[in-house]
């Protein structure tokens, strides 16, 4: 996941460290934790049969965030803008499959007119 961090930081963005992707299994937020920052060689070795989410949060400002009093809403500590996306990925014998990509490569909801 190191490459996401390097790419974002080259563009002067930051990767939130307080949240991560997660495994999908018997429970929704399962093992492993999928960090979106770090150094090459750190983290868990991915193995065939693992299913997990990749869901980085990328901030215009600093990577620090805080959770509001409702216990759910997260905001950037410096009030900068942030974006988040998510994909579900499975590790296969020959590599990986991204299950949340559209077969028709939709980049916006198909019911909306361009």
Give the label of every model feature segment.
Residues 38-114:
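Charged, cofactor-coupling segments
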Residues 8, 28, 82-83:
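Glycine-rich, acidic
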